[in-house]
Amino acid sequence: MSESIRLSDHFSYSKLLRFTLPSICMMVFTSIYGVVDGLFVSNFVGKTPFAAVNLVMPFVMILGGMGFMIGTGGTALVSKLLGEGKKDEAHSTFSMMVLFTLLLGLALSAVGVLTMPAVARLLRATDTMMPDCVLYGRIVTGFTFTFMLQNVFQSFFIAAEKPRLGLFVTVAAGVTNMVLDALFMAVFKWGVAGAAIATGLSQCVGGVLPLIYFLRPNSSLLRLHPTALRLRPILQACGNGSSELMSNISSSLVGMLYNFQLLRLIGEDGVSAYGVLMYVQFIFVAIFIGYSIGCAPVVSFHYGAGNQNELKSLLRKSVLLMGLGGVALTAAAMLLASPLAKLFVGYDADLYALTTHAFRLFSWSFLLAGFNIFASGFFTALNNGAVSAIISFLRTLVFQAGSVIILPLLLDVDGIWYAITSAEIFAFIISCTFLLAKRNKYHYM
């Protein structure tokens, strides 16, 4: 069982999969309950509110992405300290990251609530979409601080050698969201406000339960205790995790660009179709992200301990697993395109046909996505936030934005659906280049 596996162990394929499985399940389940949110809005509220939620979602994810940055960057730092045998410093740094997350999250919650009408206008919400954009956005961003805490603790549960407990918390949050979605939208008919409240309350479960656990005496590697904020560790953690923030911001900005292009070329149906693709992509890519999150503390620990042979083994095994996973998920996406589109938008024949066609073109991106996500996470785990951020920035912003702008000129609307695959191909080249260039510094080859 994964609770018996220690960061200091030698990891076979079996042990690596057992250790990372809870974080994979955690990320997949997080994505699934996000998808359920979309399903309820689309089927019980309508396609215009569904488009409104999808339009404002990138801004919400940018705010929440700060939690991913602190969580992944802080976990890399804390795991390295544990590998070096500096347990007291690891506890202090962990406590500092949680306090910083809480304070920053409260500030961002206020910003989100106050600026939402201006944000909706900036995102070019139509007159029919504007009320739902503002209502949903204000409620959800009001819970940004709990969303950030949830994201931070997802990473730290793994460093604390409690991945299964992290999975339990995620499942509890997800079940809360799904039950409240059904209650607020299907029974009480609260519309997008119900979806937003359900999401916010589920994030309270995901953010507050771990806080209580780590504040109390526990059997994990980490403890929370009173601490002061120190600039250097915070900047170091933010630097390490900058690729995760960059990925979040870039994906959100590119999502806005997709929406602009689709509104121009197709209209609201294009935004709705793209929303379906994003919800399903969350689930598929969550497998790769979950593996990278689960593997990262192991890489950081052995890097801190100077175990070069284990680093080589972890990289070799991970590359093979990402390759096999890419093939499997691409095949699954092709086969499931039609039924998944029907699940979301089967009530509208034209929208269903558009979504199915788009999904089949979009699916090729999964072939290389896992490798690129792991490469970025691998450098974060090695405490090289700069390289990780470059890979992430190029992959999620530069290459995708360029493709979304250029490919429609050559392939019309199909160019939009092929854009992400084009970006993954270029990112694969960059990832391979950095892995080869840095091999002598870190001795992982």
Regions found by a protein language model. Give the residues of each.
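Small-residue-rich hydrophobic transmembrane alpha-helices
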Residues: 50-110, 147-166, 273-337, 369-391
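Transmembrane helical elements of multi-pass membrane transporters/channels
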Residues: 18-37, 139, 150, 173, ...
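N-terminal transmembrane alpha-helices
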Residues: 8-45, 58-73, 77, 81, ...
